[in-house]
Regions:
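Short amphipathic alpha-helix with an adjacent loop that forms part of the alpha/beta core around
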Residues: 237-249
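Glycine-rich phosphate-binding loop and adjacent beta-alpha segment
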Residues: 203, 222, 227, 263-326, ...
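C-terminal hydrophobic helical "lid"/dimerization subdomain
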Residues: 1-3, 239, 267-271, 313-364
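Mid-domain Rossmann-like dinucleotide-binding core that forms the NAD(H)/NADP(H) cofactor-binding site
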Residues: 145-235, 242
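Short Gly/Pro-enriched turn/cap motifs at secondary-structure boundaries
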Residues: 21-22, 54-60, 120-125, 131-132, ...
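Short SAM/SAH-binding signature in class I
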Residues: 251-257
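Glycine-rich beta-strand-centered segment in the early N-terminal region that forms part
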Residues: 21-37, 50-101, 106, 144-146
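NAD(P)H dinucleotide-binding glycine-rich loop of Rossmann-like/cofactor-binding domains
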Residues: 94-185
Length: 364
């Protein structure tokens, strides 16, 4: 049996579609056939050269598949069996560092990953851009039977990313249900999920700030819960800043969630927050350059700035729980993924970069 995979050849280079032997499942691993695998913004950063990963390799960390091979006795320890639909989580924290012991394993200082292994050593296919994937059983999260696996795949990384950032806010004493006004900067996959999540966590008013000409994203944000979408290109930064500073009787907004990845967004975020406002920043993930900020504003406004990177398996579980508790979202989410075969990888990456797709998925 053979399986195709899209091999990452390096920044700015075309992916190569290659065939690999489907080998026996190693001990401790699950063997999955592809249902859907997302192209993440992180993968785009790899291809653009703003984040570095070795090549050649099979990248991709948003793999959702159906288990076709495992050691059944060993799998019982994880509540898994053949035929289960699962999300493959790539993070392997050490469990021993101070962060892991404090429950912050998403930021383990010795973090390893399950994907990106050698394509020259069996079983070859550890990454998500493949028709078959091998992931340790300990890193597989079962998708409940009442959740469409393609729906689960659509926000398999953006969802846990958002939830983890919000959990850090909650850990710092922020009660989302008591937030009056929140602003989401950026309407990519993370920002889009953040809109629906914040609204359903009880935030009274959720605004989004975006740029460019993409009415589809703006309409979707409103459908998912945004009370209003501001567009920097049409309305101008200064006008939007003034409008948001007027919230809460002229105090500004309570919470800002940065998901644009644009460094200049941080300046506006600090400007629109009220005194003691909370700024969640999971979006600044690539080396996009520096900007000038006014540190005095952090002090005088007593801003609470919380960076967030990565997520843990418990955030993936919380994501699936969120989908299960909000089934009305599924009919909307299932329409958001633009689907491509693995053989169409270069077209898929180009379309993902264009911004025209809400979410780009590889399917079998």
């Amino acid at each position: 049996m053979k399986a195709k995979a899209a091999v990452f050849m390096g920044a700015h280079k075309d992916f190569e579609v290659r065939e690999f032997d489907v080998t026996e499942c190693p001990a401790g691993y699950g063997q999955m056939e592809l249902i859907a695998s997302g192209i993440c913004g992180t993968d785009i950063h790899f291809h653009n050269g703003t984040l570095v990963v070795g090549a050649p390799t099979v990248i991709g960390h948003e793999f959702v598949g159906r288990i076709i091979g495992l050691d059944e006795k060993e799998a019982e320890k994880y509540g898994l069996k053949k035929g289960d639909n699962v999300i493959a989580d790539i993070a392997v924290p050490c469990g021993e560092c101070i962060l892991c012991k404090n429950g912050d394993d998403a930021n383990c200082v010795n973090m390893q990953v399950t994907n990106g292994g050698s394509i020259d050593v069996a079983p070859y296919l550890y990454g998500g851009y493949a028709q078959v994937n091998y992931t340790p059983l300990s890193n597989l999260i079962k998708i409940p039977e009442d959740i469409d696996p393609v729906v689960a795949a659509t926000f398999a990384c953006p969802g846990p990313t958002t939830i983890h950032a919000c959990s850090l806010a909650e850990k710092a004493g922020v009660n989302l249900s008591e937030i009056n006004v929140a602003v989401v900067q950026g309407l990519g996959p993370v920002g889009t999920f953040a809109v629906m999540y914040l609204k359903r966590m009880g935030v009274k008013k959720v605004y989004a700030v975006t740029a460019g000409d993409n009415a589809k994203r703006e309409e979707l944000a409103v459908t998912l819960g945004a009370d209003k979408v501001f567009n920097l290109t049409r309305e101008g930064k200064d006008n939007i800043t003034r409008a948001l500073q007027a919230e809460n009787g002229g105090l500004g907004v309570d919470l800002c969630f940065e998901a644009s990845g644009a460094p200049q967004a941080v300046v506006q975020g600090m400007d629109i927050l009220r005194n003691r406002g909370v700024y969640l920043i999971p979006g600044q993930y690539s080396a996009s350059g520096g900007i000038e900020i006014q540190p005095q504003m952090i002090t005088f406004k007593a801003l609470h700035i919380i960076g967030s990177s990565q997520y843990s398996m418990k955030d993936v579980e919380a994501y699936l729980d969120f989908l299960g508790k909000n089934p009305e979202l599924s009919p909307v989410i299932e329409k958001l993924g633009s689907k491509y075969k693995v053989e169409q990888i270069n077209e898929a990456v180009a379309d993902a970069k264009s911004g025209n797709n809400i979410k780009t998925l590889l399917v079998r």
